[in-house]
């Protein structure tokens, strides 16, 4: 595992990518600089390196600006959003499944549970909600979506012991 930290600096990013590839990395993961802001230079930097951007932006919340690319030498690159909760969603639902497959591990199997209370979500987006699994007096499990699902709220991430994933519909 090669690890590096760079700021919003294209040249430093290039050096970090080169160092990771020289160390034999087959999957690279970065956080930040993948959206559309002034300092979001990674999509252009990857294209300049000859990378093929396979997707950039996904219909999920949180974590929409996620980027996935194949670098010129074949290594894979995940550009996760800089927001901590959005980055956690990208890691959990995109990076980890790919790594499991590359390691020959079986896909995870979801645990289907009733919701403890009603939940609203935007149409057309897959929602990844921080939740707690509850056990009632009768021995039945349910999933409680925690209040404060905005991606800037970190407290619910600490309180959660599960994710509730609700499809686009």
Region roles according to the model:
Residues 1-49:
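N-terminal small/polar loop signature for handling phosphorylated ligands or for N-terminal nucleophile
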Residues 45-169:
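Flexible glycine/proline-rich
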